Amino acid sequence: MFNRIFLFLLTNLAVLMLAGIVMSLLGVNPAQMSGLLVMAAIFGFGGSFISLLLSKFMAKRSTGAQVITEPRTPTERWLLETVRRHAQAAGIGMPEVAVYDGPEINAFATGANRNDALVAVSTGLLQNMDQDEAEAVLGHEIAHVANGDMVTMALLQGVLNTFVIVLARVVGGIIDSALSGNREGGRGFAYYIIVFALEMVFGLFATMIAMWFSRRREFRADAGGAQLAGRSKMIAALERLSLNHGQNTLPSQVQAFGISGGVGEGLRRLFLSHPPLTERIAALRAASGSAM
């Protein structure tokens, strides 16, 4: 975890330094630029990491997930035993296991680190999947935890937030100066309107980047689930999802780490956290064929 954080911070620092050089060549005041970079990094990473640290609490609160402390039914006992087996195989600490009330077939994982995670499944999943399929879904979620996807996505979001804040203000300042004829850095009311509009536009592009990365992580989590539970079980689980694919009612902060995502065509696909189920199934089958 700490190696990943160090690498992301180092990368972010290098890119921000490059941005500072470029902006200085464009005539942006270096003193103002330094303050802007610091402010952007604080707000960009601050919000992202606060969300990460509160992710388990917010997920439980928003879904009404009930953590299983003492199993009361054979199903709850099986859930705990399966998650424990997958966690041991993946080399991570035992996550909390919870069930939340929801008709859709879904599950999610969240948490600030690999050894303090939460894995939750919907009642719809327990009612509509057999144990082999559910085992594969749990393997998929454990793979998310083992791969450190929650931390990685928080770091990526921090980098993107930082760039949105910086670029919106730098470009907004240049546009405002050009429109007003003021080259001394004065700020009129129009500047704040321009910055707000640019943050919306750049934010859309940042979301596309984050969702593209999330889709890549889904393929990797599918492969991890196949390794933990078996490739045929993982394929069967995804096929079951494709037959019972409904609206994703998970809260936005955990949708990226669920087993099931939304459906969309055209531009909408750019904002999906999950690849189409057909592509995920095809990837698993292709990997199975190449391994033979």
From Swiss-Prot:
One GO MF term attached to the UniProt entry: zinc ion binding
Cofactor binding note: Binds 1 zinc ion per subunit.
Catalytic machinery residues: 141
Cofactor(s) listed: Zn(2+)
Any single biological process term in GO: proteolysis
Family: Belongs to the peptidase M48B family.
UniProt-recorded name of the protein: Protease HtpX
Gene: htpX
